[in-house]
Amino acid sequence: MTMNQTVLGFDYGTKSIGVAVGQSITASASPLLALKAQDGIPNWDEIEKLIKEWQPDLVVVGLPLNMDGTEQDITQRAKKFANRISGRFGVKVLTQDERLTTADAKARLFELGGYKALTKGQVDAVSAVLIIESYFENQYD
């Protein structure tokens, strides 16, 4: 891993795609927003704006798997989303196991603000943070 990388993380979903940005130098990430998706199809112009704004060295897309590691129906769609980002924008894209990120994101948000903090967009954006953080953890294992 180079000295400092900017990493954009996506928590792919069919209705909403959480987005976060991270820095490898601090191995931390911050939630940005949740993009609306229609049946898994994002507004590619919005993604292009994010790529241009943050100029990531790497994009990490969460890979939804069952607890036993097998693929779900949405796993292939997340892989396709990752491939499209790579193809459209020419950035390096990796996938990261995202098992438990939604539960962890809800727990983290609940600690900060109770039930009112648990809006779908916030959960998705914090899930994207956790995807980036787990990517960083795996780099140093």
From Swiss-Prot:
It comes from the Bacteria. InterPro entries: RNaseH-like_sf, YqgF, YqgF/RNaseH-like_dom, YqgF/RNaseH-like_dom_sf. GO terms for biological process: rRNA 5'-end processing. It holds the Pfam family RuvX. GO terms for molecular function: nuclease activity. It is found in: Cytoplasm. Its EC number is 3.1.-.-. Belongs to the YqgF nuclease family. This is Putative pre-16S rRNA nuclease.
